[in-house]
């Protein structure tokens, strides 16, 4: 099923990815999208959200650094994207960390139909209402079954769920996949998950099957990180960051197919 031709489609189409994202990761996210052939726009003024919805091929909403004006812009943009039939991705950064973040995410989920939600296990557990010891915006630890969390959130909100971790879990509520790729250096650079959300969005902009787009995006991204690590003389985050950007710029269908480790099932067992 996963031939990774979505990766080629991103290069061919160069989708316009509208990011309402956080101040920590905006630059890296924009450069990462440019590296894979997408066209990023980082805009958050509420006055232009309706107009941008008519232009963008996908909208990515990231709650990493919130304020009231930004939340208003997110809601306007999300509703406009729904009207336009544009895919919308939510990255609920640190949703379990504070009551304000939980409130904002619940409001966004109530007002916007999201094509996909991508986060770590702690963030998706918070949305699912499952007990989990999150550590700020990091995943933390918990005993809940990650597949069950993915299934619950996917079915409750009619969306594709992407739970990033040592093994990525992707589900649309009926289909499940695990991606067992990725460099151990990825979690040592800030914003790697936020960029993945944007990359998933760029794949959804050119592939109507959001589940397939998500699996192929996660695998392509993780495999690129492995190639980046191979090129390093020193396995350190400061060296890895630019090398990973280069790996994204030089990724290919052939490279991804050669190393992708995907386990797919039709149901949660």
Swiss-Prot record:
SUPFAM superfamilies: Ribokinase-like (SSF53613). GO terms for biological process: thiamine biosynthetic process; thiamine diphosphate biosynthetic process. Pathway: Cofactor biosynthesis; thiamine diphosphate biosynthesis; 4-methyl-5-(2-phosphoethyl)-thiazole from 5-(2-hydroxyethyl)-4-methylthiazole: step 1/1. This is Hydroxyethylthiazole kinase. Keywords: ATP-binding, Kinase, Magnesium, Metal-binding, Nucleotide-binding, Thiamine biosynthesis, Transferase. Belongs to the Thz kinase family. InterPro entries: Hyethyz_kinase (IPR000417), Ribokinase-like (IPR029056). It comes from Listeria monocytogenes serotype 4b (strain CLIP80459). Catalyzes the phosphorylation of the hydroxyl group of 4-methyl-5-beta-hydroxyethylthiazole (THZ). Substrate binds at residues 42, 191.
């Amino acid at each position: 099923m996963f031939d990774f031709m979505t990766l080629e489609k991103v290069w061919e189409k160069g989708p316009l990815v509208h990011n309402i994202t956080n101040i920590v990761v905006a630059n890296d996210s924009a450069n990462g999208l440019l590296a894979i052939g997408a066209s990023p726009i980082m805009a958050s003024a509420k006055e232009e959200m309706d107009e941008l919805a008519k232009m963008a091929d996908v909208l990515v909403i990231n709650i990493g650094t919130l304020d009231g004006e930004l939340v208003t812009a997110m809601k306007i943009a999300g509703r406009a994207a729904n009207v336009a039939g544009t895919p919308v991705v939510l990255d609920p950064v640190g949703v379990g960390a504070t009551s304000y973040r939980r409130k904002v995410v619940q409001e966004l989920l109530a007002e916007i139909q999201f094509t996909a939600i991508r986060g770590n296990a702690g963030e998706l557990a918070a949305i699912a209402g499952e007990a989990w010891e999150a550590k700020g915006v990091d995943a933390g630890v918990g005993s809940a079954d990650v597949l069950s969390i993915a299934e619950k959130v996917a079915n409750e909100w009619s969306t594709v769920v992407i739970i990033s971790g040592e093994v990525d879990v992707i589900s649309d509520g009926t289909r499940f996949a695990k991606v067992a790729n990725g460099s151990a250096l990825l979690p040592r650079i800030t914003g790697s998950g936020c960029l993945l959300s944007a990359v998933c969005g760029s794949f959804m902009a050119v592939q109507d099957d959001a589940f397939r787009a998500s699996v192929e995006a996660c695998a392509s991204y993780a495999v690129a990180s492995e190639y980046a690590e191979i090129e390093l003389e020193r396995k350190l985050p400061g060296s890895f960051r630019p090398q990973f950007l280069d790996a994204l710029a030089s990724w290919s269908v052939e490279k991804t197919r050669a190393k992708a480790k995907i386990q797919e099932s039709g149901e949660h067992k």
